[in-house]
Amino acid sequence: MADETKATDAGQRYAQSLFELTIENGSLQKVEADLKSLKAMVADSADLRRLIASPAFSAEDKGKGLTAVAKKAGFQPLTTKFLGLVAANGRTGDLLGAISAFVELSAKHRGVVTAEVVSAAALSPAQLKGVQTALAQALGKTPEVSTRVDPSLLGGLKVRVGSRLFDASLRSKLDSLKFALKRA
């Protein structure tokens, strides 16, 4: 959930359509894995980001580029067709948002909730397991946890689940204390 990409209305519609197709043909998990892999590739490759975002490339060139990447990565045929369709319709600017929306739909379908845990230092496997267990008990759903390190927290955790933020960081406690002392 460290992802800040929001789906546009068009991206949401593409995600919903792809989601329904994957449910029909039973390829939900494979297509989701393909899309997550593509999103990671985009994050790692400036050239791929430029291909998706730049108006200098025609829709045809974008389609050829995305389908070539998909074939080389061994993506499902449905994923490859989806990428070609998005490019052909001139909607590559909506692609990352559509992927985020698709992943959300898939998680909701599986009864999984995504959570982002931000800590001052990297969590050990035992600490991560403890956070997952606590979230599962609090939310009543299986959490899919992503972690991020932010040294400015000084200690403690911040956990974001959907639009809710649980802030148990030392930084926020010190800020609260500072504010209380200024008011006194």
Swiss-Prot record:
Q: What is its main location?
A: membrane
The chain's disulfide connectivity reads: none
Superkingdom per UniProt:
Bacteria
List the InterPro entries.
ATP_synth_OSCP/delta_N_sf, ATPase_OSCP/dsu
In its keyword annotation, does this UniProt entry include Cell inner membrane?
yes
For this protein, what is any one GO molecular function term?
proton-transporting ATP synthase activity, rotational mechanism
Question: What membrane topology was assigned to this protein in its record?
Answer: Peripheral membrane protein
Presence of the UniProt keyword ATP-binding in the record: no
Q: How does it assemble?
A: F-type ATPases have 2 components, F(1) - the catalytic core - and F(0) - the membrane proton channel. F(1) has five subunits: alpha(3), beta(3), gamma(1), delta(1), epsilon(1). F(0) has three main subunits: a(1), b(2) and c(10-14). The alpha and beta chains form an alternating ring which encloses part of the gamma chain. F(1) is attached to F(0) by a central stalk formed by the gamma and epsilon chains, while a peripheral stalk is formed by the delta and b chains.
Write the protein's name. Answer: ATP synthase subunit delta
Q: Which organism is it from?
A: Caulobacter vibrioides (strain NA1000 / CB15N)
Q: Which gene encodes it?
A: atpH
